[in-house]
A protein has these predicted regions:
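Acidic/polar helix N-cap motif
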Residues: 6, 24, 100, 158-159, ...
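N-terminal helix-turn-helix DNA-binding module of bacterial transcription factors
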Residues: 1-60, 73
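Amphipathic helical "hinge" segments at domain boundaries
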Residues: 45-118, 195-198, 209
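Short beta->alpha connector loops
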Residues: 98-101, 122-127, 246
Length: 337
């Protein structure tokens, strides 16, 4: 365990300055405080007085760690968390972990060092170390969107029900060859949606062909490449389902690069309705997730967890809504698109 003196050396300040920042006993310039807090987070320094007492004075602040702020899906969630926390009298510290497990661990450590009352976390694909740290420090936490650990309160959508609605919709047009472009590897939501895709096909009496499924796509570019590969098969699917908004964009790009028309040549549906989905031609059929409600309830759950740390963890699943638009039509039998 690093010492306060080692933190001081790394930050290039005196031990007393580090002590003032840790104990909040004297004003320290923001520049020096940032150097010290960065050193504390990087070294994993744990103040002895905090370790001796789990009950420190409330700071009326919470940390919000988002795995990819650039993803439009999280915009409404962030706004709702901040609005509800403001109503509850809580300040929100926001950080982007950039889907990086190392940065994720650094962020939750920094939140703890700043003595936030709790954390709302949208986990990365490999959140084990960050979650273990939160559990070890007994820091109240709510996981959003990605169900990763049953030791914490969690909130997300009913992925199985939403996928069933998508497949039922596509099958109602007569499609029997349906492909799937899944989302990021390692995420519980990705696994749930892949499993639900298989189950929903079976429920409709349809066969799931392995070469019609791209189970892991890290970004829009990989979704574009996966869509190209599936559409180049000798007997490609007549409809595609996408696992999130990024894979939807990648699929649309590949379809257009192939010179194909939606839905004349290929039907397309997917997860994550987004604000400019109406700007596509045709307008896309997508599952709308209740992002505002996810954010609001996440803040409420955390506030209740802070007030009652011994209550059993809760898992909340919210219903998503199918927004049926114009991107589905009856299938056209094609070979080697």
């Amino acid at each position: 365990m690093p010492t306060m003196a080692e933190v001081a050396r790394r930050a290039g300040v005196s031990v007393s300055t580090v002590s003032h920042v840790v104990n909040r006993t004297r004003f320290v310039s923001p520049e020096k405080a940032q150097l010290i807090n960065d050193a504390i987070a990087a070294m994993g320094y744990q103040p002895n007085e905090l370790a001796r007492s789990l009950k420190v004075a409330s700071t009326n602040s919470v940390g919000l760690a988002i795995s990819a702020i650039s993803n439009p899906y999280f915009t409404d969630i962030i706004c709702a968390v901040e609005a509800e926390c403001a109503r509850l009298g809580l300040m929100v510290f926001l950080s982007d972990t950039q889907e990086d497990p190392d940065r994720e661990l650094q962020v939750v450590r920094a939140f703890h060092q700043r003595r936030v009352d709790g954390v709302i976390l949208a986990p990365s694909g490999s959140p084990e170390r960050a979650i273990a740290y939160l559990a070890d420090k007994k820091l109240p936490c709510v996981l959003i969107d990605r169900f990763a650990d049953d030791r914490f309160d969690q909130i997300g959508v009913e992925n199985e029900t939403a996928m069933r609605a998508l497949i039922d919709h596509v099958a109602s047009f007569g499609h029997r060859r349906i492909g799937y472009i899944a989302g990021q590897p390692g995420l519980a939501t990705t696994r749930e949606r892949v499993d639900a895709f298989h189950a929903s096909l079976a429920a409709n009496g349809l066969e799931c062909l392995p070469h019609y499924v791209s189970p892991e796509n890290v970004d829009t570019a990989s979704a574009t490449a996966s869509t190209h590969a599936i559409l180049s098969l000798p007997a490609p699917p007549t409809a595609l389902v996408t696992g999130n908004n990024m894979t939807t964009i990648g699929a649309v790009r590949a379809i257009r690069e192939k010179g194909l028309s939606i839905p004349r040549d290929l039907s397309l549906v997917g997860f994550d309705d987004f604000e400019w989905a109406d700007c596509f031609e045709p307008r896309l059929t997508l599952v709308e997730q209740p992002c505002t409600e996810i954010g609001r309830q996440a803040a409420t759950l955390l506030s209740e967890r802070i007030a009652s740390s011994h209550a059993p963890p809760r898992a909340v699943r919210l219903k998503a809504t199918l927004q049926a638009r114009e991107s589905c039509a009856r299938p056209v039998n094609r070979r080697s698109i």
